[in-house]
Amino acid sequence: MSGQGPQRRLLGSLNATSPTTPHFKLAANQTGPRCLEVSIPDGLFLSLGLVSVVENVLVVAAIAKNRNLHSPMYYFIGCLAVSDLLVSVTNVLETAVMLLVEAGALAAQAAVVQQLDDIIDVLICGSMVSSLCFLGAIAVDRYLSIFYALRYHSIVTLPRAWRAISAIWVASVLSSTLFIAYYNHTAVLLCLVSFFVAMLVLMAVLYVHMLARARQHARGIARLRKRQHSVHQGFGLKGAATLTILLGIFFLCWGPFFLHLSLMVLCPQHPICGCVFQNFNLFLTLIICNSIIDPFIYAFRSQELRKTLQEVVLCSW
């Protein structure tokens, strides 16, 4: 992808460009401001991608192996792992092909590289959209399990969960295809940015409401035990910290990428916005980091899944 559109790393590798360096540097031109550009070494990018691949493959394998994990909640978590897996695999594949082309180990015409790049971009964008969707689906599922506990199993059934999962994947493929085909259209970029904001607001509202309900429940228990202050204060701090970490990681890892898209609409030619565009690979790296962190937030906290994961790692099928 390019600086002012989806970055085309493969196509750009056909041109004479300087290699990336593993340090911060200030970029400047004759008319623009000095910019802080963070260069991401390809080795680091590939390493992070491979770590994410291993983690998410283990999550999917554990859920597939243990029948006790064959429930809507874990299916959503498994689909999130698949989405994060695709994010990592496609980015690793794109970087690997780019390095092979630059090294002359892979001879390809520009048209062939462009077609391959378009396919990879569709996969990257689709996996990003599906990842955001499943983060929202997990939030909705947890909300229903708390506020509609008695009716949860009649509301969130396996057929409904599979229909929701299918709809998310179909919508992700269609939207990513349109985005790559019409990435230079303002309306498409605005839709993608609006989608991110909607997911952020949805998750914030649901998790804040869940935190409020949990604190209310803790106060009720504290009154029964006649030690309201200590229990309420301790739970409030723990709950607030968990919520801050969950939403903070989501915003920090995904926010810069969508800031990049927003600036493409608001100020595509402004020198200061150009400084942001120069760090697009950093924003992709943050998304890869999110794919590494997601299993720790949503999957590895489950004792049942951790136990199954140990069996998978030890190959005790």
From Swiss-Prot:
Which residue ranges are assigned to the Cytoplasmic compartment in the record's topology? 64-72, 141-163, 212-240, 301-317
Q: Where's it mainly located? A: membrane
Keyword Hydrolase in record? no
**Family assignment?**
Belongs to the G-protein coupled receptor 1 family.
- Example GO molecular function: melanocyte-stimulating hormone receptor activity
* Annotated function: Receptor for MSH (alpha, beta and gamma) and ACTH. The activity of this receptor is mediated by G proteins which activate adenylate cyclase. Mediates melanogenesis, the production of eumelanin (black/brown) and phaeomelanin (red/yellow), via regulation of cAMP signaling in melanocytes.
Where are the coiled-coil regions? none
Q: How does it assemble?
A: Interacts with MGRN1, but does not undergo MGRN1-mediated ubiquitination; this interaction competes with GNAS-binding and thus inhibits agonist-induced cAMP production. Interacts with OPN3; the interaction results in a decrease in MC1R-mediated cAMP signaling and ultimately a decrease in melanin production in melanocytes.
Note one Pfam family from the annotation. 7tm_1
Protein name stated in the entry? Melanocyte-stimulating hormone receptor
Q: Kindly give the membrane topology term recorded for this protein.
A: Multi-pass membrane protein
SMART domains assigned: 7TM_GPCR_Srsx (SM01381)
How the protein is affected by changing G5C? In allele blue fox
Top-rank taxon, per record: Eukaryota
Where do we find S-palmitoyl cysteine lipid attachment? C315
Which cellular component, as a GO term, is one annotated location? plasma membrane
Glycans attached where? N29
Q: Which UniProt keywords apply?
A: Cell membrane, G-protein coupled receptor, Glycoprotein, Lipoprotein, Membrane, Palmitate, Receptor, Transducer, Transmembrane, Transmembrane helix
Residues passing through the membrane, by range: 38-63, 73-93, 119-140, 164-183, 192-211, 241-266, 280-300
